[in-house]
């Protein structure tokens, strides 16, 4: 995830940062960037009501909301964030992935793709050796290094996943 820079922090005086409960257990309620920056974040779960929380906090003039790992939002929570954006004119930035290891959309991602005013794709490169294509697929591996095709949609741990272009994802499935 991209952490707001100090320049953005100056513009957005009162930021509310959110991270999902499933990720917070690993990261101690902080949002971590790949370059080592970290910021404290409020933790949400599937029952969290963004409207109640933000409307109470807006007495302190919230100027920006950032949601990390937004694929873990429910579709109702995405609608709540849209309402906050529309009614309070608060910019909301959501960061997350589109699909799971089976190539299926997360419910939060589906809702965001349907309702977002603007979508910016942050590109990454396929992890297959010597490939330079854009990564669009996520593969999950078990402890023995074997690719997994079944199981819970959520299994936290970056060491269990690799990103591939569609071609190399498909080829990795053939070897099973």
Model-derived regions, located:
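Single conserved hydrophobic/aromatic residue that forms the stacking wall/gate
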Residues: 1-8, 12, 174-175
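Walker B beta-strand of ABC/ABC-like P-loop ATPase nucleotide-binding domains
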Residues: 65-66
């Amino acid at each position: 995830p991209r952490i707001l820079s100090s320049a953005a922090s100056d513009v957005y005086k009162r930021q509310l940062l959110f991270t999902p409960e499933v990720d917070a257990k690993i990261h101690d309620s902080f949002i971590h960037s790949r370059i080592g920056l970290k910021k404290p974040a409020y933790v949400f779960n599937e029952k969290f009501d963004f409207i109640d929380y933000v409307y109470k906090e807006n007495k302190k003039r919230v100027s920006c909301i950032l949601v990390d790992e937004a694929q873990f939002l429910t579709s109702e929570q995405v609608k709540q964030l849209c309402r906050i954006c529309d009614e309070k004119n608060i910019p909301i930035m959501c960061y997350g992935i589109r699909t799971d290891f089976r190539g299926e959309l997360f419910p939060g991602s589906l809702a965001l793709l349907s309702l977002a005013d603007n979508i910016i794709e942050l590109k990454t490169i396929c992890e297959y050796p010597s490939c330079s294509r854009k990564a669009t697929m996520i593969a999950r591996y078990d402890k023995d290094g074997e690719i997994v095709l079944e199981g819970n949609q959520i299994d936290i741990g970056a060491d269990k996943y690799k990103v591939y272009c569609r071609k190399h994802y498909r080829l990795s499935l053939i070897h099973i």
